Design a protein with these regions (language model features):
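Conserved N-terminal entry element of GNAT/NAT acetyltransferase domains
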Residues: 1-15, 153, 157-161
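Conserved GNAT-fold acetyl-CoA-binding loop/helix
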Residues: 22-48
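A short helix-loop-beta-strand connector motif used in the catalytic cores of GNAT acetyltransferases and
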Residues: 47-59, 76
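Conserved beta-hairpin
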Residues: 56-68
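Conserved acetyl-CoA binding element of GNAT-fold acetyltransferases
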Residues: 73-85, 93, 114
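Conserved acetyl-CoA-binding loop-helix of GNAT-fold acetyltransferases
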Residues: 88-101, 124, 128
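C-terminal "cap" of GNAT-fold acetyltransferases
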Residues: 109-123, 128-132, 136-161
Length: 161
């Protein structure tokens, strides 16, 4: 396994991060969510969504060429994707450890994340990382036309403050 340095994302990396997100999202979710949502999840839409959340995004990979990212929103591990070529390298585990440390440092005692129902690869990774599936819930996915309710698995993990 590679030793990964997790670092803040830069605005110059938005296009590459958006590509990682687009590729990973479509591979993991396109067959699990309504076709309308899949059509709205364009490369441009991911880049647009990244701009306001950039202060909460951390990446792994060479400067200018990240191969994975993680974004937080309040007490939620909001997004995490690793490029196909970096899977199995420890990149996701490094991003997860960093996310958990940041959430804990922010005073979060129980973190949560949403996982698409049927995204078994992600579910196995979360469970291996100590997260526990606690419920099926309705998640409000942001889209260009408003919010789309989706049933998802909710995972939680207690953190040390």
């Amino acid at each position: 396994m590679t030793s990964w340095n997790v670092r803040p994302a830069t605005s110059a990396e938005i296009d590459r991060i958006a590509q990682v997100w687009f590729d990973g999202w479509h591979e993991a979710h396109a067959h699990l969510v309504p076709p309308d949502l899949t059509r709205m999840r364009t490369l441009e839409s991911f880049a647009e969504r990244l701009h306001p959340m950039l202060p909460d995004v951390r990446v792994v990979g060479a400067s200018g060429a990240p191969v994975g990212f993680c974004a937080l929103k309040d007490d939620e591990l909001y997004q995490m994707f690793v490029s196909h070529e970096a899977r199995g390298s420890g990149a996701a585990a490094a991003l997860m450890a960093d996310a958990e440390a940041r959430l804990s440092a922010a005073g979060v005692t129980t973190a949560w994340l949403a996982c698409a129902i049927g995204n078994d690869r992600a579910a196995r990774f979360y469970e291996k990382s100590g997260w526990r599936r606690t419920a099926t819930m309705t998640y409000h996915a942001e889209t260009p036309t408003g919010v789309l309710p989706l049933d998802v698995w909710r995972y939680e993990k207690p953190l040390r403050a």
